[in-house]
Amino acid sequence: MKKIIVIGSGFAGISAASFMARAGWDVTVLEKHAMAGGRARKFEEQGFSFDMGPSWYWMPDVFERYFNSFGKSVGDYYKLRRLDPSYRVWWPGEPMDIPAGYDQLKALFESLEKGAAGKLDEFLKEAAYKYDVGINKLVQKPGRSLTEFIDTDLAKGLLKLDVFTSMKKHVGKFFTDPRLRQLMEFPVLFLGALPEKIPALYSLMNYADIKLGTWYPDAGMHEVVRGMQHLAEELGVRFEFNKDVQQLEIENGTIKKVWVKEQGENESLSAYTADVVIGAADYHFIETKLLPAAYRSYNELYWEKRVMAPSCLIYYVGINKKLNNILHHNLFFDTDFEEHGKEIYQTKTWPVDPLFYVCATSVTDDSVAPAGHENLFFLVPIAAGLEGDTETLRDEYFEKLLIRFEKQTGEQIKNSIVFKRSYAVSDFVDDYNAFKGNAYGLANTLTQTAILKPSLKSKKVKNLFFTGQLTVPGPGVPPSLISGEVVAREIVKEFKN
């Protein structure tokens, strides 16, 4: 039986491990931390349970298809509920709830702009086509050769995919009300560029948002990780935790040993052997820190020229009261959307008056906070690579967010805070070896799509492959599941003999 080692147990790592086990390989996952999940880990403190990273469950069909691939379903591992309203947007003057029901949403659009209900139908008809082609075809490509894209259906539909039109221009064709425009542009904010730089192909995200809905796995997003880990273990995958990979030892262009430090008191070094290694940790870290220079596919200049999706400034907050005026997901769009976008992607500076997001899972789920309490997750998108990430700076931002949160919601929480922990650029570097402290990976710009992304196979090491948000298909939880499947498919194809 061929042996494979997967470095890292985020969504992509567990996915790749599971597909390799299904193909009959002996699979070991080496994880630096004490639990699986990568950015989707969780922690518990004072009776509060916090998801550390992803908080939006979109594209439920991708998760269902993943479990179906192994003869299972989502319901075998965790329970989902659809949120209605999907989320609340706080404009400068008033909040707006985004209903899950399509007819109600159309009525909302029409109330803001005459004719917008019909325009939404047209917009989503196009977005549905993009979603179908994007999820079923484009993201399934390994991005190793242009010939992969010689596909009659793709060629016929190239214009309909709007690859060469910007998201901003595309949205502007349908809607004039600034609130509607902002609402339709917001899902691409985390893809790594301003709406004027992101291809309108990604209006497929609006289809995911509006038609497929916003869901919540009971007990939080880490339940998805637990479910995937459970399935992987049923398939025979072994998970080894507190194993920090230090070096990949190469002989004649092949990895012969994976050197690992045991986290803990002894911190002893041990060697693992495998026929193939999958890097599901940070691509840049594996290339520049684990490989000898002669075996790196990309130099530092290459990485410096990459456009990164954002990092984040996060606060995990527990309060000793219940709130009446917030939903599960809350988007605070009470400041200048475009200015904040420029601070993330153009000037790359600490934002002056940023948009922010608050997730309150305890509004939906009593199990994540003590009785009579709320757990709040504040998130500010910021540029990757920012310096000066000090406790003082974090405290200053938190004070700003608190003032705006209290003003908009009419809820006083400052004196009710019983727990607070912050997380930012330096933590992403320390915990995940994240290049420039990125949170979401490589930006999905046109010049960083498909074959223009870092390759899922090393160009210089015969048995080293990659998966995750710095390679195909790109950032986000559903794409990470697909990334694991795509790399496994390539390995099985290459090593079938």
For each feature predicted by the language model, list its residue ranges.
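A conserved FAD-binding loop/helix module that cradles the flavin
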Residues: 54, 469-491
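Helical element adjacent to the flavin cofactor pocket in flavoenzyme catalytic cores
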Residues: 204-255, 259-262
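Mid-domain catalytic core of redox enzymes
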Residues: 246-369
